[in-house]
Amino acid sequence: MWLRVFTAFLSFTAGACSGLKVAVPSHTVHGIRGQALYLPVHYGFHTPASDIQVIWLFERPHTMPKYLLGSVNKSVVPDLEYQHKFTMMPPNASLLINPLQFTDEGNYIVKVNIQGNGTLSASQKIQVTVDDPVTKPVVQIQPSSGAVEYVGNMTLTCLVEGGSRRVYQWLKNGRPVHTSSTNSFSLQNSSLHIAPVTKEDIGNYSCLVKNPVSRMESDIIMPTIYYGPYGLRVNSDRGLKVGEVFTVDIGEAILFDCSADSYPPNTYSWIQRTNNATYVIKHGPRLEVASEKIAQKTTDYMCCAYNNITGRRDETHFTVIITSVGIEKLAQKGKSLSPLASITGISLFLIISMCLLFLWKKFQPYKVIKQKLEGRPETEYRKARTFSGHEDALDDFGIYEFVAFPDASGVARMPARSVPACDGVPGQDLHSTIYEVIHHIPAQQQDHPESSSQDGEEDACLDRHDEAGLQELGHCKEQDKGKHSRAKQCI
């Protein structure tokens, strides 16, 4: 045996040194039982060759190698015992095994001989393993009902029906589980033992089983672990919380919520302390307190949480203080308007005021008259009516009231038509007198007895006007020059 091995080694060394090379992709090949397995082999040389010989040998541990088949050039010479199991297509040195069985597991040796000027030899060895693929594993938990934190233990077992050379690995939340003070594994890692269980052991567990030809993972399973209560706290939907004190305005209803981390969920009870006595006022996670129904301004409460599986209990205390700020709020609640209503009212008032101001400015009588007169051409003023002895003096003065506004020089424009003057009074003086009367028109008429008597005399004087009416008017004006109120009434 050792002689043959030494001879093969010398042949391989000589072949490698002489230029013959035999190569295989891998020295270990894994096969699946019942399927075909192909062992690829590549060889090459640089010298002329007349004959090429390929030989396949099979050996198991502690046994002699067996001849499987061989070829010279393109002729195959199989072992009659294995002629239907092994196939080779020369000059290709690769070997096909079909079907593969557990008995085919071992070392396969390929040897290549080249006959030319001399004989060159080289060989390679391939280890073949045969396995059955694993099936999907199933995880079982004991006890199935769960375990109590710090009290109970738990065992997870991975069950696989098929597969050879199985390797087990436990995963928690997708990461490998390692040995710790509470975690331990069986001999082949097929079981995971947790003792004692804690809240930190809660998670998604799975079992991964693999072998050289396959791998399968179980469905995720979450063990049941009872724990808690932890982190008991009380919150409210309103009011001011400072530490364990809630400040509430009188007249407001406040809702308290008590919660804690626990499995299964806790049962809650609310306890009120009054006059050194305590009594349960409600069961459940929520408590509503109407502040106006509380007789005391400061009341102590307590929320208790109890886990009926773990048997653990926790409680938290808090104080509710009723303030009197709410009384003023209630008194002003019906009287005060909302900010939106106030803003809306102010906006409407400003809009209406601006509209009224715009209309008042737009339709003022004196401005309308002034705008209309300013738009009239200058020729219309020159066509104004003159005094006549047969017209009413009041109507004449009324007409001059609209047209008598001064120009840039401060002198009112008079009609172009000449007007006769009174006796001894030139026409230029008449123009100045009429302008002064128009320029000093009062804004409002004054009523008194003297003015009434003067009106009668003025009317009588004006009724007698004729071609010399203007002279009489000037005479009347001369008589009443010192009486300012009478001149106002004539106008």
From Swiss-Prot:
It is found in: Golgi apparatus membrane; Cytoplasm, Cytoskeleton, Spindle; Cytoplasm, Cytoskeleton, Microtubule organizing center, Centrosome; Midbody. One of its GO terms (biological process) is cell division. It comes from Bos taurus. Residues 361-491 are cytoplasmic. Pfam families: Ig_3. The gene is HEPACAM2. Glycans are attached at N73, N117, N153, N308. Residues 444-454 have a biased composition (Polar residues). Keywords: ADP-ribosylation, Cell cycle, Cell division, Cytoplasm, Cytoskeleton, Disulfide bond, Glycoprotein, Golgi apparatus, Immunoglobulin domain, Membrane, Mitosis, Repeat, Signal, Transmembrane, Transmembrane helix. Residues 137-221, 223-319 form the Ig-like C2-type domain. The keyword Disulfide bond applies. Poly-ADP-ribosylated (PARsylated) by tankyrase TNKS during late G2 and prophase, leading to translocation to mitotic centrosomes. N-glycosylated. SUPFAM superfamilies: Immunoglobulin. This is HEPACAM family member 2. Residues 472-482 have a biased composition (Basic and acidic residues). SMART domains: IG, IGc2. It comes from the Eukaryota. The keyword Disulfide bond applies. It is a single-pass type I membrane protein. GO terms for cellular component: centrosome; Golgi apparatus; Golgi membrane; midbody; spindle. Required during prometaphase for centrosome maturation. Following poly-ADP-ribosylation (PARsylation) by TNKS, translocates from the Golgi apparatus to mitotic centrosomes and plays a key role in the formation of robust microtubules for prompt movement of chromosomes: anchors AKAP9/CG-NAP, a scaffold protein of the gamma-tubulin ring complex and promotes centrosome maturation. PROSITE patterns: IG_LIKE (PS50835).
